[in-house]
């Protein structure tokens, strides 16, 4: 499904914000 890639993107963006 799309949840896998979306979670990966969310994690990457979150780490960038930190």
Swiss-Prot record:
Protein name: Antimicrobial peptide 7
PTM statement from Swiss-Prot or TrEMBL: Amidation on Leu-18 is required to adopt an alpha-helical conformation in a hydrophobic solvent. The absence of amidation leads to a decrease in cationicity leading to a more than a 10-fold decrease in antimicrobial activities.
Native source species: Xenopus tropicalis
Leucine amide modifications at: 18
Predominant cellular place of this UniProt entry's protein: secreted
Tissue specificity: Expressed by the skin glands.
Function recorded in the entry: Has very strong antibacterial activity against many Gram-negative bacteria and the Gram-positive bacteria S.pneumoniae and Enterococcus sp. There is moderate antimicrobial activity against the Gram-negative bacterium P.aeruginosa and yeast C.albicans and weaker activity against the Streptococcal strains and E.coli. Has hemolytic activity against human red blood cells. Seems to disrupt the membranes by adopting an alpha-helical conformation.
Gene Ontology biological process terms, A to Z: defense response to fungus; defense response to Gram-negative bacterium; defense response to Gram-positive bacterium; hemolysis in another organism
Gene Ontology CC annotation, any one: extracellular region
Disulphide-bridged cysteine pairs: none
Keywords in alphabetical order: Amidation, Amphibian defense peptide, Antibiotic, Antimicrobial, Cytolysis, Fungicide, Hemolysis, Secreted
Subcellular localization(s) per the UniProt record: Secreted
């Amino acid at each position: 499904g799309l949840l896998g890639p979306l979670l990966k993107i969310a994690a990457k963006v979150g780490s960038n914000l930190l």
